[in-house]
Amino acid sequence: MNKKPSNKTFHYNGLTIELHPEIYEPAEDTFQLLEALEVTECDRVLELGTGCGIISLECARRGAKVICTDINPYAVELTKNNYSRNLSLLKGNVEVRNGNLFSVIKPGERFDAVIFNPPYLPTRAKERVGGSGWFDAATDGGVTGLAVTKRFIEGLHKYLNKDGRAYFVFSSLSDRKKLDTYLSNARLKSEIVLSRRFNDEQIDIYRVHF
């Protein structure tokens, strides 16, 4: 990794978060997800696709014990740096792992809350940026917008506590009927806990449980 952090920072609930040009920058969907989360200091939390780490750090600020993962090595390095930067503000802790979704979660590890802001933009092959950058990994949801979300839903039964809950972001640009099918096949109950419209797109935060 030879690209240095951008040194661009922002503040959220007292946390100082540094950004990086190879990492998805927190946007409206990030803050909407943060607003919807119900996490307490008793919770064991898993965040997939942590990016700059803002969601995991906010959960740790509330006192949760957090494991977060990201396929992007720049995100892993940056989240570790942001964790160290904000350590004195956190009542909980954060462990950062480099891997794709649940691939680095150990057998038997289960969580009270699982959180994911997935790549949800419907994307055809010709629309991909390509190259060595990480933009596609952060945004490409496949043709339906649900390629990665489907894998997330299918993995929950192995890692979510029976009385736990999972939160994820859904865009109205994606296929909601397919999402309903995936949730039904996984025997998950769902509700939309926060919904907002941005121009021609509606962003929903789903909360699901067994």
Where are the regions that the model predicts?
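Conserved Class I SAM-dependent methyltransferase catalytic core
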Residues: 18, 23, 32-35, 146-205
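Class I SAM-dependent transferase core
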Residues: 2-39
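Glycine-rich, phosphate-binding/catalytic loops in enzymes
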Residues: 62, 130-134, 184-186
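Short, structurally constrained coil/turn elements
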Residues: 11, 39, 88-90, 184-186, ...
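Mobile active-site "lid"/loop adjacent to the S-adenosyl-L-methionine
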Residues: 118-148
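C-terminal lobe and adjacent flexible extensions of AdoMet/dcAdoMet transferase-like proteins
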Residues: 206-210
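Active-site-adjacent beta-strand anchor residues
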Residues: 69, 142, 168-169
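Conserved SAM/SAH cofactor-binding pocket of Class I
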Residues: 28-130
